[in-house]
Amino acid sequence: EQLAKACPKGVDIYYENVGGKVFDAVLPLLNTSARIPVCGLVSSYNATELPPGPDRLPLLMATVLKKRIRLQGFIIAQDYGHRIHEFQKEMGQWVKEDKIHYREEITDGLENAPQTFIGLLKGKNFGKVVIRVAGDD
């Protein structure tokens, strides 16, 4: 409901990096000719079996067909790794110019890294996750 209120005109581009319930919430909001670049499915990285419930593939395929949605997977390192230096230069400049904003969740101590990583896979954070192993002194 909140997503539908936030996107009253629907969704034209959905960058898929999570999958699962997030994708389920976005699917009915996709507009005709929407585009979905798929870079990851973090919600299912630890899955050892199919999720419970009905098979949702027919709904996905019907939606892709009826709305003429373009769905394309890509792996950044393989597809764009050759442009890493260009990216670092441009992104670094944009961050300096305050054109790019991001959230950081900092956890102190290497001993907390395993639990923080598990939380990342379960969607318990928002933004960039950092493990601080030493102070800034």
Give residue spans per PLM region.
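Terminal helix/beta-alpha structural elements that buttress the NAD(P)+-binding lobe
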Residues: E1-D137
